[in-house]
């Protein structure tokens, strides 16, 4: 059995040979599915420009649905939809032009914050007055005894590892 080609746009597969693939890629269903896929990623400005240049779809206005769907040559948007879309386009344009105005910046500067933090820490009761609790290291349940573990899995000694100055590797 030969290889199969799976088309992500159409969500279907077929035997992969030059004739079948070319026939599928030039087919109306594939072209429509591909257009729908790429239309999902269009920005509001491009959609608004296209919809403003189209006349209203008579069948969509009368029945509320159109057989052509997103491939219709006419617009399925009402005047209110177009107005909302133009407001969205304007908001996106403003956000690109003035990114600092829309972003919430904290008031004050880093120096002010550091001063406040230093005052808060100095006025707060010292947490160092409390005795430091040392956690006792325990091996996980089910592990073999410490003597049987390789050195990489053993806990370090209480004083840490000794540093040897003249160590030769290799």
Swiss-Prot record:
Superkingdom per UniProt: Eukaryota
SMART domains: ZnF_C3H1
Keyword annotations of the record: Metal-binding, mRNA processing, mRNA splicing, Nucleus, Spliceosome, Zinc, Zinc-finger
GO molecular function: zinc ion binding
Main location group: nucleus
Subcellular location, record wording: Nucleus
Entry-linked InterPro entries: U1-CZ_Znf_C2H2, Znf_C2H2_sf, Znf_CCCH, Znf_CCCH_sf
GO cellular component, one term: U12-type spliceosomal complex
C3H1-type Zn finger ranges: 51-79
One biological process term in Gene Ontology: RNA splicing
SUPFAM superfamilies in UniProt: beta-beta-alpha zinc fingers (SSF57667), CCCH zinc finger (SSF90229)
Assembly notes: Component of the U11/U12 snRNPs that are part of the U12-type spliceosome. Not found in the major spliceosome.
Record-given protein name: Zinc finger matrin-type protein 5
Gene behind this protein: Zmat5
